[in-house]
Every structure is written in C-alpha cells, then in structure tokens.
Amino acid sequence: MTLNSSTEDGIKRIQDDCPKAGRHNYIFVMIPTLYSIIFVVGIFGNSLVVIVIYFYMKLKTVASVFLLNLALADLCFLLTLPLWAVYTAMEYRWPFGNHLCKIASASVSFNLYASVFLLTCLSIDRYLAIVHPMKSRLRRTMLVAKVTCIIIWLMAGLASLPAVIYRNVYFIENTNITVCAFHYESQNSTLPIGLGLTKNILGFVFPFLIILTSYTLIWKALKKAYKIQKNTPRNDDIFRIIMAIVLFFFFSWVPHQIFTFLDVLIQLGIIRDCEIADIVDTAMPITICIAYFNNCLNPLFYGFLGKKFKKYFLQLLKYIPPTAKSHAGLSTKMSTLSYRPSDNMSSSAKKSASFFEVE
C-alpha cells in the first residue's frame, strides 16, 4: 500500500498494491461462520466460568482469581467479535466508523496480552504451589493475586495503545472500499518493526519461555518425588496435562505470531510479491480463529482440571443454585496446603493429585 496525501471527509485515502490479496469467497463465508461459533461458545463457556468461580466457589484461591480474570478478558474480546464477523462477511468493508475501529482493534490486542500474561502468572503460581508449597505460602495470597491481576490489566492496556493510536479507517481508492487497518508510511520503518517485535517477544516469546520453564520444573519435581516415594503410584495424567498445556499454548499462537510479523514486512514494502501477500492475508484470519478460539476455551480447559470446578459447573447446568453446603469443604481445601516443612518432596507428589484445583 502507498499512502496518498488526500484526506477528504477526514478519511485518509490509500492505494492497495495487491488489491486481490486475501479476497476469496470462501474466506468471506468461512471466517464469519467461525467467528460466530467462537462468539457463541466463548460467551456461553466464559460466562459459566465467571458464575461458577465467583458465585459457587466464592473466589477463595489464587488460581481462581487468575481464571476469573482470564474469563473476563475473553468476554471483553468476544463482545467485539460480531463486528469483525460483519466486516469479513462484507468483504472487508468497515461500516462502523473510526471509533469502533479503534475500540475493536484495541480489544483484540488487549485480549492477547491479558490472556498470555494471566496464563504465565498461572504457570508460576502452579510452580510455587507444587514445588515450593511451604516457602510460597506467604507470597501466594489473595491480595497478591488481585494486585497482580490489576497490574496485568494495566500492562495489557498499555500494550494495546498502539491499536488505539495507529489503527484507523482508510479508503482504498483502487478498490473503492473502506477498511479498518494499520497503515504505516514507508519512510517510517522503526514504528511498525518495533510494534511487530513487541507483539512477538512480549506477547509470545517471553511468556512461552516462562510457561515452558515453570512446567518443566514441575515435571522434574514430580518425577523426583515419585522416585523418592516408591510406594506412591505415578500419575501419568499429570505429565500428559503438562505436555498438553505447553503444546496447546505453543501451537495456538505460533502461526498468528509468524503471519503478524510477515504482515508488518508487507506493510513496510519489504515484501512486495503479491502472491506472498495473498498467502499472508488469506492465512491471517485463519490463524486468528485458531489463536482466539483456543484462548476462549482456556478458562474451561484449566477449570475442568479441578474436581470441584467440574462439580459446581454441572450443578450450574442443572440449575442448582449455590448453597452454604457448597462451601462447607473448607477443611478439605486447607488440607491441600498443610504440608510438613521436612516433607517437601512428598508434598509435591501429593499435590499432583490436585494439580489444577482452583477451589
């Protein structure tokens, strides 16, 4: 694309060097359909997660705080998804004005950072709870968890500011359509490269390394605990869960991160081949569907690793309201934290039985 100086009606006019890139009839049908499915499943699932954690489980643990915020971040994003579905169904014609363009774009960016940061904190919390249960008890408090979530929301908001500032409505003169897009002037290459690298590094590389390290250390601690506790049967499900969590995160986000960076190179004119631009523009919405569908399933995925979460979730589906009896098991909850200081490795093996309990 080449920026033009014309700004009639307050909308900048640009030329699209590859006007047919990513414009395929199957994309205009398939992607809105997938967005609609993600919207329905995500709103339903994440709303139930919020109700279960807040009203049934009463938000009593660190893990539940992170999961609640994860579900809320997903709901904020999902509310803007119908706009993107309409936008794609209308063959990338944006009818909602510049303000909604910025808000919807910021919501997508915010969800990316908030979800990734929360999953990273959740992995650190699991590491501390399982590997260092005694040492971390004073640090793993509800106050610390809530303050951490506030910081995460602020950081995600700051990381989303470029979408508010630089995402705008543009009129493409050679195709006569109005789009909601990032557009960079070719002479200013520092900004888009900086934003692209920030998204790649801050939104994926660093979090993935922390998540990988946390669960690897958990894996090693549990293996060591099982060797010491020879009479304790090894729970292979825990190791499968760890592997699934790491791979789930990696393969959900890698495609989107790769094509995001390629898109920056196209915007800068470093990649000028329209065939490559077509591949990138066609694949981009598909990678978005993969990343954000998995993102919206995360609260359910992590929640269902806890037995009591599944119990309350099924109660909710059966329209059984939360009662005082639902929270009578406080001694059971506290027992998972009552370890003898001299029995740290033994407690790791015991703790693996409730690897992701959020109650």
From Swiss-Prot:
Residues 339-359 are annotated as: Disordered. InterPro entries: ATII_AT1_rcpt, ATII_rcpt, CCR1-9-like, GPCR_Rhodpsn, GPCR_Rhodpsn_7TM. C-terminal Ser or Thr residues may be phosphorylated. GO terms for molecular function: angiotensin type I receptor activity; angiotensin type II receptor activity. It is a multi-pass membrane protein. Is expressed in the liver, kidney, aorta, lung, uterus, ovary, spleen, heart, and vascular smooth muscle cell. Expressed most abundantly in the adrenal gland. It is found in: Cell membrane. It comes from the Eukaryota. The chain crosses the membrane at residues 26-55, 62-89, 99-125, 142-165, 191-216, 240-268, 279-304. The keyword Transmembrane helix applies. Residues 1-25, 90-98, 166-190, 269-278 are extracellular. One of its GO terms (cellular component) is plasma membrane. Pfam families: 7tm_1. Glycans are attached at residues 4, 176, 188. PROSITE patterns: G_PROTEIN_RECEP_F1_1 (PS00237), G_PROTEIN_RECEP_F1_2 (PS50262). Keywords: Cell membrane, Disulfide bond, G-protein coupled receptor, Glycoprotein, Membrane, Phosphoprotein, Receptor, Transducer, Transmembrane, Transmembrane helix. Angiotensin II binds at residues 15, 17, 167, 182-184, 199. Coiled coil: none annotated. One of its GO terms (biological process) is cellular response to dexamethasone stimulus. Disulfide bonds join 18-274, 101-180. Residues 346-359 have a biased composition (Low complexity). Residues 56-61, 126-141, 217-239, 305-359 are cytoplasmic. Receptor for angiotensin II, a vasoconstricting peptide, which acts as a key regulator of blood pressure and sodium retention by the kidney. The activated receptor in turn couples to G-alpha proteins G(q) (GNAQ, GNA11, GNA14 or GNA15) and thus activates phospholipase C and increases the cytosolic Ca(2+) concentrations, which in turn triggers cellular responses such as stimulation of protein kinase C. Belongs to the G-protein coupled receptor 1 family. Interacts with MAS1. Interacts with ARRB1. Interacts with FLNA (via filamin repeat 21); increases PKA-mediated phosphorylation of FLNA. This is Type-1 angiotensin II receptor B. It comes from Rattus norvegicus (Rat). The gene is Agtr1b.
